Each structure stands twice: as structure tokens, then as C-alpha cells.
Amino acid sequence: RHGLLIIEDNAQAIGATEHGRATGALGDAAAFSFYPTKNIGALGDAGAVTTSDSSLASAVRALANYGSDRRYHNIYEGFNCRMDEMQAAMLRVKLRHMEEECLIRENTAHVYSSTICHKAVITPTVSPGMRHVWHQYVVRVKDRDSFRRYLQEQGVPTDVHYAVPPHM
């Protein structure tokens, strides 16, 4: 209606599905992060954009190549965001094990959810028809800092991923 594109942030959801449809295939394009801490991590910074729109693909490819659509011809103010061969080779190997890794995280999350039985701890839920790939297992509590101290005393590491939301 307004000519807007839907671009999915699929940085932490590779392997997730909504009613059988893979995340990353729901919009006009999707951005994937392969930072080492992600579900499928490269050796260093890496990422990808997927789309079935050939003109959008050409624009993204040019932006990632200094804004150039061909050698020494810049059509945009771009960046150097090309993935090198070592990152691609590592990801190619890891991709073969993605489903196995997703199942391990799903099983671990199930163990957490079925054994954390305290009224002060709200565990995550998954809606019917959804497949969660558990990049993180996040719980909600009233006093985060006290809870983190308690877990630390029990030898359980925790982290606050975004102490200040990125948009703030």
C-alpha cells in the first residue's frame, strides 16, 4: 500500500520457523549475522542478506562492495562488507550441522523450562506452530541484579546482553 519493503532481522533466528515457513523468508529481504557468538558463527565478523528481488539483490551487493556495481564505478556511497573465503568456508562446514545444533539448543531449553519451577522466575514460552532456535535463553525476574548475583554464587554465568537498548 505504501511501497515499503519488509526487511527481516534474522541475526539470531536462523533455523527458526513460523508454521513451517523459515524465518528469513517472510519479508522482501532478510539480514543474517554470522558473528562468532551467533547460532552459526564464523571465525570473525560475517553476515549475509537474502532476497528473491533481483534489483534489491544488486543494490545490496553494490553497497557491500564500496557502493560499486562494477570495478571503479560507484553508484552508492558504500562499504567494504564482502565476506572473505575463510569465513565462507567455515560457515559452509557449520551449515551442515545447523539442524543438529538447533536440536541441542531446543533440548537444553526444554530442560531449563521444565526444571526452573520458581514463581519469581518467568521462563520463555513458544507459541504453537513456532520453532524457536534459542540463540539465548532469557528469563524475567523482578530484581535482575540480585538474581544474577545468586546465579553467580551457584556457578551459573549470566549476562545482560543489551544493558541499554541499542535504539536508546
Question: What are these model-predicted stretches?
Answer:
Residues R1-G20, D53:
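Catalytic PLP-binding core of fold-type I/II PLP enzymes
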Residues G3-L5, A22, A29, P157:
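Proline-centered loop/turn at the N-terminus of a beta-strand
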Residues I14, T23, I40, F79, ...:
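Short clusters of hydrophobic/aromatic residues that line enzyme substrate/ligand-binding pockets
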Residues T17, S52-M168:
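PLP-dependent aminotransferase class I/II
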Residues G24, T37-N39, S127-G129:
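Short Gly/Pro-enriched turn/cap motifs at secondary-structure boundaries
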Residues A31, A48, Q136-V138:
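Short aromatic/hydrophobic contact patches that present stacked aromatics
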Residues N39, L43-A48:
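Glycine-rich phosphate-binding loop of ATP-grasp-fold ATP-dependent ligases
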